[in-house]
């Protein structure tokens, strides 16, 4: 069975004239991309080997094998780079790869279905879990032990304790989402999510 692919980096604009590029990594240690072996596009049609990288503000400046001039580097702008999930290190307790969370069923502590995990975000004030209900607006909740007390990867679900701040229309929307999914079909039954980990 093929291992799930994890996006570990995205290539940005060219840097200089010798084929270097700006590289945004999604790893806990930005330089970990040097240790994962060949990186590929999502469809596997292209492979890239990072030959060197250095830190620069909020990104890396990196070189790839075979990319030696600015024109070649410019053509890579926007390319996302992936590695197989089994090539990454195991996570610690209460740490999760984003890709392992996306798609999990979300339920309330009372067992009512809410929808599925759509994404994990961080806008600078902590991690946010986005839940997509069967209909209506998505729910954006803090990804903390208090709000998400249980992550059951084996069972394919997360348990959500809806915070008191979700009231009025938002709380009603969440309750309606749970009710709507009940009527359809029940799904199969401080956190630190990360897109990838240290080598």
Curated annotation (Swiss-Prot):
The keyword Cytoplasm applies. GO terms for molecular function: ribosome binding. Residues 164-199 are annotated as: Disordered. It is found in: Cytoplasm. Pfam families: PRC_RimM, RimM. Gene3D superfamilies: PRC-barrel domain, RimM. It comes from the Bacteria. GO terms for biological process: ribosomal small subunit biogenesis; rRNA processing. Its main location: cytoplasm. The keyword Transit peptide does not apply. Keywords: Chaperone, Cytoplasm, Ribosome biogenesis, rRNA processing. One of its GO terms (cellular component) is ribosome. Residues 93-169 form the PRC barrel domain. The PRC barrel domain binds ribosomal protein uS19. NCBIfam families: 16S_RimM (TIGR02273). Belongs to the RimM family. Binds ribosomal protein uS19. An accessory protein needed during the final step in the assembly of 30S ribosomal subunit, possibly for assembly of the head region. Essential for efficient processing of 16S rRNA. May be needed both before and after RbfA during the maturation of 16S rRNA. It has affinity for free ribosomal 30S subunits but not for 70S ribosomes. This is Ribosome maturation factor RimM.
């Amino acid at each position: 069975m093929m291992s799930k692919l994890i996006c570990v980096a995205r290539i940005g604009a060219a840097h200089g004239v010798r084929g270097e590029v700006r590289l945004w990594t999604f790893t806990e240690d930005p330089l970990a991309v040097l240790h994962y072996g060949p990186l590929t596009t999502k469809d596997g049609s292209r492979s890239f080997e990072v030959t060197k990288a250095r830190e620069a503000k909020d990104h890396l400046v990196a070189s790839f094998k075979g990319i030696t001039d600015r024109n070649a580097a410019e053509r890579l702008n926007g390319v996302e780079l992936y590695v197989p999930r089994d090539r990454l290190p195991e996570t610690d307790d209460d740490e999760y790869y984003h890709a392992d969370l996306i798609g999990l069923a979300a339920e309330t502590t009372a067992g009512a279905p809410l929808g599925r995990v759509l994404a994990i975000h961080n806008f600078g004030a902590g991690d946010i879990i986005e839940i997509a209900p069967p209909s209506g607006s998505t729910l954006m909740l803090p990804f903390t032990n208090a709000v998400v007390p249980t992550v059951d990867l084996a069972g394919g679900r997360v348990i959500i304790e809806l915070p008191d701040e979700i009231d009025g229309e938002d709380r009603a929307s969440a309750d309606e989402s749970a009710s709507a999914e009940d009527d359809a079909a029940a799904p199969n039954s401080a956190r630190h999510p990360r897109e990838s980990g240290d080598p």
